[in-house]
Amino acid sequence: MSHPAAHSGRMLCCRAVFCSLFATICGSVHAAGPAPLRAGMIGLDTSHVPAFAKIFNNPKATGDIACVRISAGYPGGTDLPASHDRVGKFTEELRGMGIEIIDSIPKLLEKVDVVLLESVDGRIHLQEAVPVIKAGKPLFIDKPVAGSLADAIVIYELAKQHHVPCFSSSSVRFSPGIQELLKNQELGGIAGAATWGPCTYQEGTPDMFFYGIHGIEPLFALMGLGCESVTRIQTKDTDFVAGLWKNGRVGTYRGIRRNKSDFGAVAFGGKRIVQTGKEGDYEELCREVGRFFRTGKSPVAAEETIEIFAFMEAADESKRQGGAPVSLAGVLAKAKAEAGAKLAK
Protein backbone atom coordinates (compact mmCIF):
# COMPACT_ATOMS: atom_id res chain seq x y z
CA MET A 1 0.00 0.00 0.00
CA SER A 2 1.38 3.45 -0.90
CA HIS A 3 2.18 5.93 1.86
CA PRO A 4 -0.51 8.66 2.28
CA ALA A 5 2.08 11.44 1.84
CA ALA A 6 3.32 9.87 -1.39
CA HIS A 7 -0.25 9.51 -2.62
CA SER A 8 -0.91 13.18 -1.79
CA GLY A 9 2.24 14.21 -3.62
CA ARG A 10 1.23 12.24 -6.73
CA MET A 11 -2.24 13.77 -6.65
CA LEU A 12 -0.78 17.28 -6.40
CA CYS A 13 1.63 16.58 -9.26
CA CYS A 14 -1.18 15.26 -11.44
CA ARG A 15 -3.32 18.30 -10.75
CA ALA A 16 -0.47 20.72 -11.54
CA VAL A 17 0.46 18.92 -14.77
CA PHE A 18 -3.17 18.68 -15.82
CA CYS A 19 -3.67 22.40 -15.25
CA SER A 20 -0.48 23.21 -17.14
CA LEU A 21 -1.42 21.08 -20.15
CA PHE A 22 -4.75 22.86 -20.42
CA ALA A 23 -3.50 26.38 -19.65
CA THR A 24 -5.19 27.69 -22.77
CA ILE A 25 -8.61 26.78 -21.46
CA CYS A 26 -8.02 27.77 -17.84
CA GLY A 27 -10.15 30.84 -18.49
CA SER A 28 -13.22 28.63 -18.31
CA VAL A 29 -11.88 26.24 -15.71
CA HIS A 30 -14.60 27.07 -13.18
CA ALA A 31 -17.31 26.18 -15.69
CA ALA A 32 -15.73 23.24 -17.50
CA GLY A 33 -12.41 21.59 -18.20
CA PRO A 34 -9.74 20.54 -15.70
CA ALA A 35 -10.46 20.99 -12.01
CA PRO A 36 -8.58 23.89 -10.42
CA LEU A 37 -6.13 23.29 -7.61
CA ARG A 38 -7.90 23.32 -4.25
CA ALA A 39 -6.37 26.09 -2.13
CA GLY A 40 -6.67 26.50 1.61
CA MET A 41 -6.18 29.72 3.54
CA ILE A 42 -4.58 29.77 6.98
CA GLY A 43 -5.28 32.86 9.10
CA LEU A 44 -8.50 34.66 8.17
CA ASP A 45 -7.65 37.90 9.98
CA THR A 46 -6.54 40.21 7.17
CA SER A 47 -8.40 42.08 4.45
CA HIS A 48 -6.27 40.18 1.93
CA VAL A 49 -8.34 37.07 2.67
CA PRO A 50 -11.70 38.12 1.18
CA ALA A 51 -9.93 40.15 -1.52
CA PHE A 52 -7.86 37.18 -2.71
CA ALA A 53 -10.81 34.78 -2.43
CA LYS A 54 -12.95 37.01 -4.66
CA ILE A 55 -10.18 37.13 -7.27
CA PHE A 56 -9.46 33.39 -7.34
CA ASN A 57 -13.10 32.32 -7.13
CA ASN A 58 -14.39 34.72 -9.76
CA PRO A 59 -16.24 32.61 -12.38
CA LYS A 60 -14.77 34.91 -15.05
CA ALA A 61 -11.16 34.39 -13.90
CA THR A 62 -8.67 33.59 -16.65
CA GLY A 63 -5.19 32.13 -17.04
CA ASP A 64 -3.19 31.26 -13.95
CA ILE A 65 -5.77 32.76 -11.60
CA ALA A 66 -8.40 30.35 -12.92
CA CYS A 67 -6.17 27.37 -12.10
CA VAL A 68 -6.71 27.92 -8.36
CA ARG A 69 -9.87 27.98 -6.27
CA ILE A 70 -10.09 28.84 -2.57
CA SER A 71 -12.03 25.91 -1.11
CA ALA A 72 -11.27 25.97 2.62
CA GLY A 73 -10.07 28.25 5.38
CA TYR A 74 -8.76 27.96 8.93
CA PRO A 75 -9.51 31.14 10.98
CA GLY A 76 -6.52 31.07 13.36
CA GLY A 77 -5.83 34.44 14.97
CA THR A 78 -3.78 35.84 17.85
CA ASP A 79 -4.08 38.42 20.64
CA LEU A 80 -2.88 41.15 18.27
CA PRO A 81 -5.68 43.75 17.90
CA ALA A 82 -5.32 43.69 14.10
CA SER A 83 -6.05 39.96 14.34
CA HIS A 84 -8.68 39.36 17.03
CA ASP A 85 -10.72 42.42 16.05
CA ARG A 86 -11.13 41.18 12.46
CA VAL A 87 -10.88 37.40 12.30
CA GLY A 88 -14.59 36.84 12.96
CA LYS A 89 -15.68 39.31 10.28
CA PHE A 90 -13.43 37.91 7.56
CA THR A 91 -14.22 34.32 8.49
CA GLU A 92 -17.92 34.99 7.99
CA GLU A 93 -17.21 36.70 4.66
CA LEU A 94 -15.51 33.54 3.42
CA ARG A 95 -18.30 31.35 4.78
CA GLY A 96 -20.76 33.51 2.89
CA MET A 97 -18.80 32.84 -0.31
CA GLY A 98 -19.35 29.10 0.13
CA ILE A 99 -15.83 28.41 1.40
CA GLU A 100 -15.61 25.66 4.02
CA ILE A 101 -14.36 26.82 7.42
CA ILE A 102 -12.22 24.23 9.19
CA ASP A 103 -11.15 24.22 12.84
CA SER A 104 -7.55 23.02 12.52
CA ILE A 105 -4.59 23.16 10.16
CA PRO A 106 -4.20 19.34 9.96
CA LYS A 107 -7.84 18.96 8.91
CA LEU A 108 -7.46 21.71 6.33
CA LEU A 109 -4.38 20.03 4.85
CA GLU A 110 -6.40 16.88 4.21
CA LYS A 111 -8.76 18.84 1.95
CA VAL A 112 -6.44 21.05 -0.14
CA ASP A 113 -3.62 20.83 -2.67
CA VAL A 114 -1.91 24.17 -1.98
CA VAL A 115 -1.88 26.73 0.84
CA LEU A 116 -1.93 30.50 1.25
CA LEU A 117 -0.69 31.44 4.74
CA GLU A 118 -2.41 34.78 5.39
CA SER A 119 -2.16 35.35 9.16
CA VAL A 120 -1.65 39.06 9.80
CA ASP A 121 0.61 38.31 12.79
CA GLY A 122 3.98 37.29 11.38
CA ARG A 123 5.10 35.93 14.75
CA ILE A 124 3.10 32.73 14.21
CA HIS A 125 4.03 32.12 10.58
CA LEU A 126 6.77 29.63 11.41
CA GLN A 127 4.56 27.45 13.61
CA GLU A 128 1.78 27.56 10.99
CA ALA A 129 4.13 26.89 8.07
CA VAL A 130 5.79 23.80 9.58
CA PRO A 131 2.81 21.39 9.22
CA VAL A 132 2.13 22.68 5.70
CA ILE A 133 5.72 22.05 4.63
CA LYS A 134 5.84 18.63 6.28
CA ALA A 135 2.63 17.72 4.44
CA GLY A 136 4.34 18.60 1.15
CA LYS A 137 1.89 21.35 0.16
CA PRO A 138 3.20 24.22 -2.01
CA LEU A 139 3.04 27.34 0.15
CA PHE A 140 2.57 31.06 -0.46
CA ILE A 141 3.20 33.17 2.65
CA ASP A 142 1.71 36.64 2.67
CA LYS A 143 3.82 39.45 4.07
CA PRO A 144 5.71 39.28 6.33
CA VAL A 145 7.17 35.85 5.64
CA ALA A 146 7.89 35.51 9.39
CA GLY A 147 8.16 37.45 12.63
CA SER A 148 11.96 37.47 12.56
CA LEU A 149 14.80 36.96 10.12
CA ALA A 150 15.78 33.77 11.95
CA ASP A 151 12.25 32.36 11.54
CA ALA A 152 12.30 33.27 7.84
CA ILE A 153 15.55 31.35 7.40
CA VAL A 154 14.05 28.33 9.18
CA ILE A 155 10.97 28.36 6.93
CA TYR A 156 13.00 28.40 3.74
CA GLU A 157 15.44 25.78 5.00
CA LEU A 158 12.59 23.44 5.97
CA ALA A 159 10.98 23.98 2.57
CA LYS A 160 14.29 23.13 0.91
CA GLN A 161 14.74 19.99 3.02
CA HIS A 162 11.23 18.78 2.20
CA HIS A 163 11.38 19.84 -1.48
CA VAL A 164 8.33 22.06 -1.04
CA PRO A 165 7.88 25.14 -3.28
CA CYS A 166 7.57 28.23 -1.09
CA PHE A 167 7.57 31.97 -1.68
CA SER A 168 6.54 35.26 -0.12
CA SER A 169 6.10 38.76 -1.49
CA SER A 170 4.36 42.08 -1.10
CA SER A 171 1.82 42.80 -3.80
CA VAL A 172 3.59 46.08 -4.65
CA ARG A 173 6.51 44.22 -6.25
CA PHE A 174 4.21 43.12 -9.07
CA SER A 175 2.41 46.44 -9.60
CA PRO A 176 2.48 47.66 -13.21
CA GLY A 177 4.56 50.72 -12.31
CA ILE A 178 7.41 48.71 -10.79
CA GLN A 179 7.31 46.14 -13.58
CA GLU A 180 7.47 48.90 -16.20
CA LEU A 181 10.56 50.38 -14.54
CA LEU A 182 12.24 46.97 -14.66
CA LYS A 183 11.50 46.68 -18.39
CA ASN A 184 12.37 50.29 -19.27
CA GLN A 185 15.28 50.12 -21.72
CA GLU A 186 15.56 53.92 -21.83
CA LEU A 187 16.86 54.03 -18.24
CA GLY A 188 20.23 52.70 -19.30
CA GLY A 189 20.38 50.32 -16.35
CA ILE A 190 19.34 51.05 -12.76
CA ALA A 191 22.17 52.77 -10.86
CA GLY A 192 20.03 53.52 -7.82
CA ALA A 193 16.44 53.71 -6.60
CA ALA A 194 14.21 55.36 -4.03
CA THR A 195 10.85 54.08 -2.81
CA TRP A 196 8.32 55.37 -0.31
CA GLY A 197 5.02 54.48 1.31
CA PRO A 198 3.04 54.15 4.55
CA CYS A 199 5.00 52.70 7.48
CA THR A 200 2.99 51.82 10.57
CA TYR A 201 4.48 49.37 13.06
CA GLN A 202 3.20 46.14 14.60
CA GLU A 203 4.13 45.31 18.17
CA GLY A 204 6.40 42.30 18.56
CA THR A 205 8.11 42.37 15.16
CA PRO A 206 10.83 44.58 13.64
CA ASP A 207 9.48 48.00 12.65
CA MET A 208 9.49 47.53 8.88
CA PHE A 209 7.98 44.03 8.78
CA PHE A 210 4.32 45.02 9.04
CA TYR A 211 3.91 47.79 6.45
CA GLY A 212 7.37 49.02 5.51
CA ILE A 213 7.78 45.78 3.56
CA HIS A 214 5.44 47.23 0.91
CA GLY A 215 8.03 49.90 0.09
CA ILE A 216 11.17 47.85 0.69
CA GLU A 217 10.07 44.90 -1.47
CA PRO A 218 9.90 47.07 -4.64
CA LEU A 219 13.22 48.66 -3.68
CA PHE A 220 14.82 45.22 -3.91
CA ALA A 221 12.87 44.42 -7.07
CA LEU A 222 14.61 47.42 -8.64
CA MET A 223 18.04 47.11 -7.00
CA GLY A 224 18.40 43.33 -6.79
CA LEU A 225 20.58 41.40 -4.36
CA GLY A 226 23.84 42.76 -3.00
CA CYS A 227 22.99 45.22 -0.22
CA GLU A 228 25.98 45.42 2.13
CA SER A 229 24.99 47.90 4.85
CA VAL A 230 22.03 49.91 6.13
CA THR A 231 21.68 53.27 7.88
CA ARG A 232 18.42 54.51 9.40
CA ILE A 233 17.06 57.84 10.55
CA GLN A 234 13.82 57.77 12.58
CA THR A 235 11.56 60.61 13.65
CA LYS A 236 8.02 60.57 15.02
CA ASP A 237 6.48 60.78 11.57
CA THR A 238 9.14 59.38 9.24
CA ASP A 239 11.66 56.60 8.71
CA PHE A 240 14.48 57.02 6.21
CA VAL A 241 16.56 53.94 5.45
CA ALA A 242 19.57 54.04 3.12
CA GLY A 243 21.17 50.88 1.79
CA LEU A 244 24.63 50.68 0.27
CA TRP A 245 24.84 48.04 -2.44
CA LYS A 246 28.01 46.52 -3.85
CA ASN A 247 29.68 48.60 -6.57
CA GLY A 248 28.62 51.75 -4.71
CA ARG A 249 24.94 51.77 -5.70
CA VAL A 250 22.55 53.37 -3.21
CA GLY A 251 18.90 52.52 -2.60
CA THR A 252 16.66 54.34 -0.14
CA TYR A 253 13.25 53.85 1.47
CA ARG A 254 11.13 56.57 3.08
CA GLY A 255 8.45 55.32 5.47
CA ILE A 256 5.64 57.78 6.15
CA ARG A 257 3.36 57.78 9.21
CA ARG A 258 1.79 61.21 8.76
CA ASN A 259 0.80 63.45 5.85
CA LYS A 260 0.29 62.11 2.33
CA SER A 261 1.53 58.53 2.18
CA ASP A 262 1.03 57.04 -1.27
CA PHE A 263 3.36 54.35 -2.59
CA GLY A 264 5.90 55.38 -5.20
CA ALA A 265 9.35 54.79 -6.63
CA VAL A 266 12.09 56.48 -8.64
CA ALA A 267 14.70 54.63 -10.67
CA PHE A 268 17.95 56.47 -11.32
CA GLY A 269 19.37 55.19 -14.58
CA GLY A 270 22.48 55.77 -16.60
CA LYS A 271 20.43 57.69 -19.19
CA ARG A 272 17.18 58.69 -17.51
CA ILE A 273 15.45 59.18 -14.17
CA VAL A 274 11.94 57.75 -14.13
CA GLN A 275 9.27 57.96 -11.41
CA THR A 276 6.23 55.75 -10.95
CA GLY A 277 3.36 55.42 -8.51
CA LYS A 278 1.53 52.35 -7.25
CA GLU A 279 -0.89 51.10 -9.85
CA GLY A 280 -3.01 48.00 -10.12
CA ASP A 281 -4.39 45.93 -7.29
CA TYR A 282 -4.08 42.44 -5.81
CA GLU A 283 -4.78 40.76 -9.13
CA GLU A 284 -1.14 40.96 -10.24
CA LEU A 285 0.03 39.18 -7.09
CA CYS A 286 -2.74 36.57 -7.36
CA ARG A 287 -1.70 35.86 -10.93
CA GLU A 288 1.87 35.23 -9.73
CA VAL A 289 0.59 33.01 -6.91
CA GLY A 290 -1.55 31.03 -9.36
CA ARG A 291 1.40 30.56 -11.72
CA PHE A 292 3.58 29.52 -8.77
CA PHE A 293 1.06 26.88 -7.68
CA ARG A 294 0.68 25.65 -11.25
CA THR A 295 4.40 25.39 -12.04
CA GLY A 296 6.11 25.07 -8.65
CA LYS A 297 8.48 27.89 -9.66
CA SER A 298 8.80 30.89 -7.35
CA PRO A 299 8.88 34.38 -8.88
CA VAL A 300 11.02 35.58 -5.96
CA ALA A 301 14.12 33.64 -4.89
CA ALA A 302 14.43 32.65 -1.24
CA GLU A 303 17.81 34.42 -1.12
CA GLU A 304 16.21 37.72 -2.09
CA THR A 305 13.42 37.48 0.47
CA ILE A 306 15.96 36.64 3.18
CA GLU A 307 18.09 39.64 2.18
CA ILE A 308 15.03 41.89 2.29
CA PHE A 309 14.35 40.79 5.86
CA ALA A 310 18.02 41.19 6.78
CA PHE A 311 17.77 44.76 5.43
CA MET A 312 14.78 45.45 7.69
CA GLU A 313 16.38 43.91 10.78
CA ALA A 314 19.58 45.86 10.05
CA ALA A 315 17.43 49.02 9.96
CA ASP A 316 16.24 48.27 13.50
CA GLU A 317 19.82 47.66 14.64
CA SER A 318 20.91 50.96 13.08
CA LYS A 319 18.15 52.71 15.06
CA ARG A 320 19.40 51.09 18.27
CA GLN A 321 22.90 52.32 17.45
CA GLY A 322 21.78 55.90 16.83
CA GLY A 323 21.84 55.72 13.05
CA ALA A 324 25.18 53.97 12.62
CA PRO A 325 25.74 51.87 9.48
CA VAL A 326 25.00 48.18 10.11
CA SER A 327 26.44 45.35 8.04
CA LEU A 328 23.93 42.89 6.59
CA ALA A 329 26.57 40.16 6.83
CA GLY A 330 26.65 40.54 10.61
CA VAL A 331 22.86 40.54 10.91
CA LEU A 332 22.63 37.45 8.72
CA ALA A 333 25.32 35.60 10.65
CA LYS A 334 23.49 36.15 13.94
CA ALA A 335 20.13 35.11 12.46
CA LYS A 336 21.60 31.99 10.84
CA ALA A 337 23.00 30.92 14.21
CA GLU A 338 19.55 31.37 15.80
CA ALA A 339 17.93 29.50 12.91
CA GLY A 340 20.41 26.65 13.25
CA ALA A 341 19.52 26.26 16.91
CA LYS A 342 15.80 26.14 16.09
CA LEU A 343 16.33 23.58 13.33
CA ALA A 344 18.37 21.40 15.67
CA LYS A 345 15.50 21.07 18.15
Give the positions of each predicted feature.
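Bacterial N-terminal signal peptides that target proteins for export
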Residues: M1-F18
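N-terminal glycine-/serine-/threonine-rich beta1-alpha1-beta2 phosphate-ribose binding loop
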Residues: C14, F22, A31-A135, E157-Q161, ...
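C-terminal helix-rich "cap/oligomerization" subdomain common to oxidoreductases
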Residues: A32-G33, V115-L116, R294-K345
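Hydrophobic residues in well-ordered beta-strands that form the structural core
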Residues: D103, I141, C166-S168
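Short helix/strand-capping hinge loops at secondary-structure junctions
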Residues: G136-P138, K143-P144
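A contiguous active-site-proximal alpha/beta segment in oxidoreductase catalytic domains
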Residues: V145-T205
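Rossmann-like dinucleotide-binding domain that binds NAD(P)(H)
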Residues: A193-K260, E303-A310
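C-terminal substrate-binding/catalytic lobe of Rossmann-fold NAD(P)-dependent oxidoreductases
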Residues: V241-R287
